[in-house]
From Swiss-Prot:
SMART domains cross-referenced by the UniProt entry: SVWC (SM01318)
Tissue-specific expression: Expressed in fat body.
Name under which the protein is recorded: Protein Vago
Chief location: secreted
Amino acid sequence: MESISSMIYLVAMMSLIIGGSQAIPYRPSAYLYNQQYCMDTLTGRQLYIGEVFTREDQCVRIQCLETLQLWEDSCQVPKLTQGNCTPVPSTNPHAEYPRCCPLYECKSYESNSGGTLEQTNIYDHYGTLRSSHLTEMIVIDGRTPPRGEIHTASARKYQV
């Protein structure tokens, strides 16, 4: 009798296990809510995967990658070889990246017998030419007047 009751108990337990596992609906892991984010340690800001922001008072763009790592983009100094180049600060340093990056103004001079040619090129932080300006200073009379002699135009008198 004892073996029959233990057999019934065993069959009942097996049916509960088999029936219970079929009652739990299958749910693929993609449907489970999994909160994953990156943490910017400088600002304490949490970023979800793919989210991007520009750090305040820094011209740096931060992005959260799928690997839960932060990617930082900052302004580069381009390798410019023509002319004397100086950085020109952004007119709006609180703008989003890359608008907050400085531009670079490069001036070059070329002299000839007729005058001087000044070329001003403006580049962005990638080294892409944004604008170019050409100024030519022409020498009309290369001779210097003798001392004491000042050339002036004749005065015109008008009556009202």
